[in-house]
Amino acid sequence: MEFLNTDIGSEKRAWVQNMAALHRVETHKLVLIEWQESARLWNSIRAFELTLRNAIDFHYRERLGQNWLIASIERDGVFNTVQCRSTLELIKTASSRIKNPSHSDLVASLTLSFWVRLFEVHQFEACGSTLLEVFTEDRTNLSARRKAYVVRLKKILGLRNRIAHHEWVVYRSGMPKLKITKVCREIDRERLNLLKKHRPPAVGLS
């Protein structure tokens, strides 16, 4: 059972060890399928994260300035409020880990959880309530659409975190059905075409 030597998480490890005693071959196959599907999903989520991150950054560079992340945590910055304090701290922490960080460095260092957070009501409103413009759907009923996107994005984030922590994905009952590619396709194509001319560094995913 060499595959048990890898870091698969305590939940998986206990199940695999118990089942392997009874059904060694079948258990091995199930675990391999789980890992293969987890890897496939992880690659899809990585691609989605890059697409969403770059679209948000391009949008806010147009509206808030080329260095909007640094500006957002200054004395009069959009995130320097009680409601957005946690977002401000995330940017400060990311900045403190990089020597003389550029805007691109900060963008690359922030993970999907940060970009999803920007759709929360306080962060969304602090930046001018324009972030849904990165998507192509009808922009009527702004509040309902924002809430719907928060739900969908958090499901994708939850799946990302389960995979990152080596938890069950394929064989976990009650896992939500996610349409990652559908959400990705909803990002405005005109903006994605512009992004090709102003491509941020494609790094920073953990």
Regions found by a protein language model. Give the residues of each.
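Amphipathic alpha-helical interface elements
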Residues: 1-206
